[in-house]
Swiss-Prot record:
Lineage: Bacteria, Pseudomonadati, Pseudomonadota, Gammaproteobacteria, Pseudomonadales
Free-text function comment from the UniProt entry: Strong inhibitor of lysozyme C.
The protein, known as: Inhibitor of vertebrate lysozyme
UniProt key word Signal: yes
Complexes and interactors: Monomer.
């Protein structure tokens, strides 16, 4: 192996070793959180007293991205999301779990299929449904998460 090949091999090995831990540190997705102790019970409690909860919401059966952790007024929270399978653009769910798993709060966002302008300014056409009786601060947190989407106008 010549010097250039050895250097290239070492660079690739270094990149692979650097990449592996970053992948291992990825935060769990909503469905993975619900498999961890404490989250499932809190999840079900969030829907207590609710009627006509869509199955994709109650089952957390849609696609999701990795969760994030943050602090709100000194209290740790885990934020997660999901969307309706095959209809993510029109149906989303954002969730905030208290860090101690004592409560969960959700925001279901729904958009109509028409008019065509819906996707240009979705906030104008959205309907919101709250789960778990979130405080004003938690509502603001979940709305900020929604508004952080570059496609949300």
């Amino acid at each position: 192996m010549n010097g250039v090949s050895r250097l290239l091999s070492l660079a690739l090995l270094g990149a692979a070793l650097h990449w592996a831990p970053a992948q291992a540190e990825e935060q769990p997705r909503l469905f993975e959180l619900l498999g961890q102790p404490g989250y499932k019970a809190t999840w079900h409690a969030m829907f207590k007293g609710e009627s006509d909860v869509p199955k994709w919401v109650s089952d957390a059966s849609g696609p999701s991205s990795p969760s994030t952790s943050l602090s709100l007024e000194g209290q740790p929270y885990v934020l997660a999301n999901s969307c309706k399978p095959h209809d993510c653009g029109n149906n989303r769910l954002l969730v905030a779990f208290r860090g101690d798993k004592s409560a969960a709060y959700g925001l279901q966002v729904s958009l109509p299929d028409e008019p065509a302008e819906v996707m240009q300014t979705p906030s104008k056409y959205a309907t919101y449904r709250w789960y778990g009786e979130p405080s004003r601060q938690v509502r603001e947190l979940l709305m900020k998460q929604l508004e952080s989407d570059p496609n949300w106008k």
